[in-house]
Amino acid sequence: MDTIHAYYTAAAEVLSPLYESGEAREIARRLLEDALGYSRSQLLVADKDTLLPPHCRERLSQQLQALGSGRPLQYVLGYAPFLQHSLFVAPGVLIPRPETEELVELVLEEAARAGYRSFVDIGTGSGCIAYALAAGLPELEGAYTLELSEEALQVAARNFDALRATTGRSVQLYRDDLFRLVESTEGALPRGLDLIVSNPPYIHPEEAAAMSPQVLEHEPHLALFAPETSPIAYYLALARLVQQGYLRPGGSLWVELNPRYAEETLEDMRRIVGPEACTAELLRDLSGKLRFVHLHYSPQP
């Protein structure tokens, strides 16, 4: 595997048992671009008989071995794209998904119209939602996140350090459990925020049989799976945050959810906040599935 062509061919073959042929070739291309520091167009026009530098060959060989064992590409590279950003990721955090990009785009659209300036991201994981919101809100006044996992906190902190270095904008991290927070009267998290945003664990454990080994064996189950006996428990707790004043009147709660429980989630969240105190709707993702709840908090004076 001394040349670009030889590595590309060999990598696609090694990955073919785990991925469809097109995806295997795409991964091989991504590895080469990362190792060589090339853009896609630079790799396309490069002489395919170009010898790979020794340090690149060693790195590519190690990465291919990791991928062959089923480790996700984003963990192997150490980063994942999210909208126009590139975020550090590691095995302790969920790999950002396209649906979550859609969620953030919806939030940013509303925030621009409403002039929202503060938010909290509950269960921040890698920090992808908070990072994109903090970078994208025109006039940011307060950015906060809540996370329980120590591994995730370390990853998010690294991403927020990078955000501060490039934009001067800061995100505050709080280590706490959502369920403990809603039962506490002394939480450190500020109240009266413009936005509450969350992509909590929402996969029912019985759905695991249909999931890929790459996800099940490598991504954190804490971030994937909802409680078996109460699969919408996180959403009920999020609704209680609204009820407890963490969201100001005129603010919005946005969540990503499991289409399987979409209607139930919407109705129970509306019930907890109070039907007369909010308007709530389900929105579909680009694949047509019910994927998001938007709850606008408008209590009567």
Regions picked out by a protein language model, each given a short descriptive name:
Residues 31, 70, 100, 129, ...:
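Residue-level signal for inorganic ion chemistry
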Residues 298-301:
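Flexible, glycine-/basic-rich loop-and-beta segments that form/coincide
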Residues 202-234:
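Mobile active-site "lid"/loop adjacent to the S-adenosyl-L-methionine
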Residues 1-44:
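Non-catalytic accessory regions of SAM-dependent methyltransferases
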